[in-house]
């Protein structure tokens, strides 16, 4: 479930792609990565990406945030979400 090693979306200062750069996502406010065009729903959500919030979001992004541009259907298995969140937590200074 994790992003491949060396993925630009995970690198500090990496480029935005289909989604925003994920470096430092845990603890960051939704819709705030410079240079990425977010949906209005994401920009206006006020969501803070904590591990708990990411768990709910990653299960079903469109249910969690109606109007999101996220095309990913979600991770139904709790362990897959936990593994991905643990990985995302390593992407920080």
UniProtKB/Swiss-Prot annotation:
A GO CC term assigned to this protein in UniProt: mitochondrial intermembrane space
InterPro entries: Cyt_c-like_dom, Cyt_c-like_dom_sf, Cyt_c_1A/1B
A Pfam family annotated for this UniProt entry: Cytochrom_C
UniProt subcellular location: Mitochondrion intermembrane space
Keywords: Electron transport, Heme, Iron, Metal-binding, Mitochondrion, Respiratory chain, Transport
Annotated stretches, region: Disordered: 1-21
Residue positions binding heme c: 70
Molecular function (Gene Ontology), one example: heme binding
Chief location: mitochondrion
Biased composition (Low complexity): 1-13
UniProt keyword Transport, yes or no: yes
Post-translational modifications reported in the UniProt record: Binds 1 heme c group covalently per subunit.
Keyword tRNA-binding carried by entry: no
Family note: Belongs to the cytochrome c family.
Function: Electron carrier protein. The oxidized form of the cytochrome c heme group can accept an electron from the heme group of the cytochrome c1 subunit of cytochrome reductase. Cytochrome c then transfers this electron to the cytochrome oxidase complex, the final protein carrier in the mitochondrial electron-transport chain.
Protein name, as recorded: Cytochrome c
Organism of this sequence: Trypanosoma brucei brucei
Species lineage: Eukaryota, Discoba, Euglenozoa, Kinetoplastea, Metakinetoplastina
């Amino acid at each position: 479930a994790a992003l491949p090693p060396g993925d630009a979306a995970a690198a500090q200062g990496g480029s935005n792609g289909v989604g925003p750069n994920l470096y430092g996502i845990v603890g960051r406010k939704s819709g705030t990565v410079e240079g990425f065009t977010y949906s209005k729903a994401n920009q206006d959500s006020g969501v803070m990406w904590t591990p708990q919030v990411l768990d709910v979001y990653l299960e079903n992004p469109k249910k969690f945030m109606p109007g999101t541009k996220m095309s990913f259907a979600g991770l139904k298995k709790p362990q897959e979400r936990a593994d991905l969140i643990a990985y995302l937590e390593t992407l920080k200074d």
